Regions:
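C-terminal transmembrane helix and the adjacent membrane-cytosol boundary/short C-terminal tail
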Residues: 85-97, 169-215
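Glycine-rich helix-loop "coupling/hinge" segments at transmembrane-helix boundaries
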Residues: 139-166, 202-205, 253-259
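Amphipathic alpha-helical segments in well-structured domains
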Residues: 11-14, 96, 149, 153, ...
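Juxtamembrane helix-boundary/capping and inter-helix hinge elements in multi-pass membrane proteins
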Residues: 3-7, 89-94, 105-108, 147-149, ...
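Amphipathic cytosolic juxtamembrane alpha-helices at the membrane-cytosol interface
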Residues: 7-9, 65-67, 80-81, 91-97, ...
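Membrane-water interface segments at the C-terminal ends of transmembrane alpha-helices
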Residues: 1-89, 126-139, 143-145, 174-189, ...
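Juxtamembrane inter-helical linkers in multi-pass membrane proteins
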Residues: 51, 98-110, 199-214, 254-264
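Short hydrophobic faces within alpha-helices
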Residues: 17, 95-103, 171, 277
């Protein structure tokens, strides 16, 4: 339970820059990583896969929206981790750890019975914010989500852009549907949280401690840390990938790095960027 100051500082230095990266940058970077001609495919080709040309695979965007889910996790996990670390530092973990050990609780059972309720209560608003954004996201869905059919938020955007008046009515009603879906998701999340909280309170009153061996506890903790580090690493490499592609002149498959670097794409399209940049500022 104890948190080392230097470890927290290191993780914070990694997480904060990931939070500041725009969502669309992460989405484009993930697309450049996992698509058939992406960086991951180039790393294992041709020495492992035997591919000398990009394979004909439908990886991203995929039919089930897995790449969109991955992109949302990559972008929102740093925010939730930062909020969680800030909450953990406010809790006297050393004192609670001593009390948990004296009551006979193990690492995992003590976390779920004592620490998790306090952390979950403080993080409820942050989780609901992330949930509302994930349901209504448009920019990442335009890049990573399937288009046949597209998510409701993307369909609303397309209807709003349509010149036909009937599409405007569809966009308005779709926005109401999206609001209702968002409210339902938030209510369902709160309901599940209350149900699990009630179950753990009953188990606590019954004296269930779920004693688990130290090896299993550390293995479970290691799996959770590995999953978090995987998505944090994916976020870092997706940002690097988007930056690399911005300076590419010639990059043939399966070369790991571009053959030529330059600013030709910036120079040729600079006039196209001027007005959007002004509007953004």
């Amino acid at each position: 339970f104890s948190q080392k100051i230097n470890m927290y500082t290191t993780l914070k230095n990694i997480i904060v820059p990931l939070i500041s990266i725009p969502h669309i940058t992460v989405a484009i970077g993930i697309l450049f990583l996992i698509q058939p001609s992406g960086w991951i495919s180039r790393i294992i080709s041709p020495w492992f896969t035997g591919w000398h040309n990009p394979p004909n695979l439908n990886i991203a965007p995929d039919l089930y929206g897995i790449s969109l889910i991955m992109g949302l996790v990559v972008k929102e996990l740093p925010f939730l981790l930062l909020i969680g670390f800030a909450i953990i530092t406010q809790v006297n973990l050393k004192r609670y750890r001593q009390q948990i050990s004296s009551l006979g609780y193990g690492l995992i059972s003590g976390w779920f019975h004592v620490i998790h309720p306090m952390v979950a209560q403080r993080m409820r608003l942050s989780v609901l914010i992330v949930l509302c954004f994930a349901v209504s996201v448009v920019d990442m869905a335009l890049i990573l989500a399937p288009s046949t059919p597209a998510p409701l938020a993307v369909k609303i955007f397309n209807w709003y852009q349509s010149p036909y008046i009937e599409s405007q009515f569809l966009a308005a009603s779709g926005a109401v549907y999206l609001l209702l879906i968002t409210i339902f998701c938030c209510a369902f999340w709160a309901f599940c949280g209350n149900v699990f909280g009630f179950i753990f309170r009953i188990l606590s009153f019954m004296g269930c401690r779920f004693l688990i061996s130290s090896f299993v506890s550390k293995s479970f903790l290691g799996v959770l840390i590995s999953i978090a580090m995987f998505f944090l690493t994916l976020g870092i490499f997706s940002t690097v990938s988007a930056g690399v592609w911005a300076f590419v002149t010639v990059w043939q498959y399966p070369d790991f790095l571009p053959r030529k670097w330059g600013l030709s794409s910036w120079e040729l399209n600079f006039e196209v960027y001027i007005q959007p940049l002004v509007n953004t500022l």
